[in-house]
Design a protein with these regions (language model features):
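Non-catalytic pre-domain segments flanking phosphatase-related domains
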Residues: 1-10, 199
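Asp-based phosphoryl-transfer active-site loop
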Residues: 6-20
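Hydrophobic residues within well-ordered alpha-helices
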Residues: 34, 68, 190, 216-217
Length: 252
């Protein structure tokens, strides 16, 4: 984009998406208006690239920080990718099996998991997505940028936090915990984007609702928390908007 005046980073679930995880026509129009005003819109999400392609097409947004900062896609190109080692995947897999949970593995092309349970189905129903294919050892031959422990809220969360201090865990919903490398976040994704593209002095705006948006707010000049946002995020916000189900982005 020539003569970029600002950059706006949008979380998806609970923010840009409506209550059924869809992009409304009003949001598509709002994104077009941002572009007309030389404001670059980017998605910043815990989801991965392959599962947000319909969202990107519907919204008109062609760049994204995905998997909580582990991967950056900018105008059709990969400009950053942080991958787990096979040994890290094996270790987490072993601990997850011991606790009776399942594990999902993410890269930009696909999602696969260790098994299907009621909790796994609930986790993906919660975000209106299909349950991933079962491929328990897919990490042996495929890249893994992010993992999810599929477990009920509060069910052994501390067990993982204590045993893997080198990782960061985000409990973003009642049925899953996002796992990224320590120090990686949506905020680090913003910094990596700016460093790679040589962007300096451009105002930044962050829109979000979840705990994983705290780092995004810290990395941007202005933070707009949705009305349905976590209280921790509202406390850090420059402005508090209405709920995502009340469709406020189109009025900005």
């Amino acid at each position: 984009m020539d003569k970029m005046k600002a950059i706006a980073f949008f979380d998806l679930d609970g923010t840009l998406l409506d209550g059924t995880s869809q992009i409304t026509p009003e949001i598509t129009a709002a994104v077009a208006a941002l572009k007309d005003n030389q404001i670059l819109p980017l998605i910043a999400t815990g989801r991965t690239l392959c599962e947000i392609q319909p969202i990107m097409k519907a919204s008109g947004i062609d760049s994204a920080i995905v998997m909580n900062g582990q991967f950056i896609h900018y105008e059709g190109k990969t400009i950053y990718s942080d991958e787990f080692t096979t040994e890290e995947c094996v270790s987490l897999h072993e601990h997850v099996k011991q606790r009776g949970h399942e594990l999902a593995f993410y890269n930009e092309r696909r999602i696969f998991c260790t098994g299907h349970t009621g909790t796994v189905k609930q986790a993906y129903d919660y975000i209106h997505s299909a349950v991933p294919e079962i491929d328990p050892t897919g990490y042996e031959n495929d890249a893994v940028n992010m993992m999810l422990v599929l477990s009920q809220h509060g069910d052994d969360d501390e067990y993982y936090y204590e045993r893997f201090p080198e990782l960061t865990f985000y409990r973003n919903g009642p049925f899953s915990i996002d796992i990224v490398r320590k120090g990686v976040s949506k905020g680090s994704g913003v910094k990596n984007l700016f460093n790679t593209l040589g962007l300096n002095g451009i105002p930044t705006y962050a829109f979000g609702d979840g705990i994983n948006d705290l780092a995004l707010f810290e990395a941007c000049d202005y933070g707009i928390a949705m009305g349905n946002a976590r209280e921790e995020l509202k406390e850090k916000a420059t402005f508090i908007s209405t709920k995502n189900t009340e469709r406020s982005e189109e009025r900005r």
